């Protein structure tokens, strides 16, 4: 065996010196996973709140209280000395949402009837910003005033159109099967000069339809959005509400805060009406029906999209869209704190057809 020669004093050696600190290797950023749809690679993106999201960081409670003074009596300090609210209290959540809309989006009137869905605005805004990125990727010189969007299930809160109009100047149609939701959403639009002329609310008269009965024969939409019903039955929805409330109360007790609201008092922030929360077959059935109907409007809509709450439903939805002939599918994940959500977007038009769409200035 050859014995390695010891280097002479001052002579360089290739042997690595021992060190107390570990050697840190430069890590390359991993590329997001992709899948191919008829020749196109599609990325699944995961990140935190969008850079353009106005709700990054802590809530500015002094500013929020200034625009909605009623919020002040609902604000408290957590054990860390940070201002917050009791998110198990429906009135607190509603007032926070109202203040966020007034402060950040210039809304002068916003309200929802008792028992209707009061969605977390930061996550809803993230969906719109990432949809905007999808459109900008296909057309970097996008004129946002040319974008026409359709929100399926606009709800009484009208959140997606509000964000889309105030942030980007898009025009919207919001549909819903519930007459009260349409009435309230219309009142919000009529009561805000910023929204007037930019949002139209339409009643879906057939609860078995999604796009049929809403998209007119000569209408074209740049994109559709949707927050689909998650549960398969009223019982499932009630159990889900109770589970969320229990988890939140346990978390608050752990942080030294009292959490007393019961299920009957939590309908506003965790609840919602039938069409908002459940439908036969749950989320999988709803988005499956949406996929099938979307094929009928393949040439009238550039991009379809919907949130998917249950990660297990993504794979089935992608397979169904591929069978239906979708040319491009994007699965975009979003992170709000510890919560991961995602939406899926698809188009039946290939890259060249999408380019021609923009050239036609829809």
Curated annotation (Swiss-Prot):
Its EC number is 2.1.1.181. Coiled coil: none annotated. Residues 1-40 are annotated as: Disordered. The keyword Aminoacyl-tRNA synthetase does not apply. One of its GO terms (cellular component) is cytoplasm. It catalyses: adenosine(1618) in 23S rRNA + S-adenosyl-L-methionine = N(6)-methyladenosine(1618) in 23S rRNA + S-adenosyl-L-homocysteine + H(+). It is found in: Cytoplasm. InterPro entries: METTL16/RlmF, rRNA_lsu_MeTfrase_F, SAM-dependent_MTases_sf. Residues 1-28 have a biased composition (Basic residues). GO terms for biological process: rRNA base methylation. GO terms for molecular function: 23S rRNA (adenine(1618)-N(6))-methyltransferase activity. The keyword rRNA processing applies. Its main location: cytoplasm. Keywords: Cytoplasm, Methyltransferase, rRNA processing, S-adenosyl-L-methionine, Transferase. NCBIfam families: PRK11727.1. Belongs to the methyltransferase superfamily. METTL16/RlmF family. Specifically methylates the adenine in position 1618 of 23S rRNA. This is Ribosomal RNA large subunit methyltransferase F.
């Amino acid at each position: 065996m050859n014995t390695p020669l010891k280097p002479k004093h001052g002579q360089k050696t290739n042997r690595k010196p021992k060190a107390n600190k570990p050697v840190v290797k430069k890590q390359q950023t991993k590329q997001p996973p992709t899948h191919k749809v008829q020749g196109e690679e599609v990325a699944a993106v995961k990140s935190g709140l969008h850079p353009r999201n106005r709700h990054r960081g802590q809530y500015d409670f002094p500013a929020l209280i200034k625009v909605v003074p009623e919020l002040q009596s609902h604000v408290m300090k957590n054990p860390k000395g940070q201002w917050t609210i009791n998110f198990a209290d429906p009135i607190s959540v509603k007032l926070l949402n109202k203040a966020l809309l007034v402060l950040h989006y210039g809304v002068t009137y916003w309200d929802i009837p008792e028992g209707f869905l009061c969605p977390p605005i930061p996550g809803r805004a993230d969906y719109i910003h990432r949809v905007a990125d999808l459109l900008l990727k296909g057309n970097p010189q996008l004129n946002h005033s040319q974008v026409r969007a359709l929100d399926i299930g606009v709800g009484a809160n009208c959140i997606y159109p509000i964000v889309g109009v105030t942030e980007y100047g898009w025009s919207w149609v919001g549909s819903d099967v519930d007459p009260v939701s349409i009435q309230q959403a219309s009142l919000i639009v009529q009561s805000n000069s910023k929204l007037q002329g930019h949002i139209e609310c339409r009643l879906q008269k057939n609860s078995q339809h999604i796009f049929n009965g809403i998209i007119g024969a000569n209408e074209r939409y740049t994109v559709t959005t949707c927050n689909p019903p998650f549960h398969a039955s009223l019982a499932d929805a009630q159990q889900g509400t109770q589970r969320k409330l229990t988890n939140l109360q346990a978390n608050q007790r752990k942080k030294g805060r009292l959490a007393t609201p019961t299920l009957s008092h939590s309908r506003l922030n965790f609840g919602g009406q039938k069409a908002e929360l459940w439908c036969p077959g749950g989320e999988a059935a709803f988005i499956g029906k949406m996929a099938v109907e979307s094929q009928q409007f393949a040439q009238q809509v550039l991009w379809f999209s919907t949130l998917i709450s249950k990660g297990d439903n993504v794979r089935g939805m992608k397979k169904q869209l591929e069978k239906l002939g979708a040319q491009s599918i994007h699965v975009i994940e979003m992170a709000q704190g510890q919560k991961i959500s995602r939406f899926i977007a698809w188009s039946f038009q290939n890259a060249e057809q999408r380019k021609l769409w923009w050239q036609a200035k829809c």
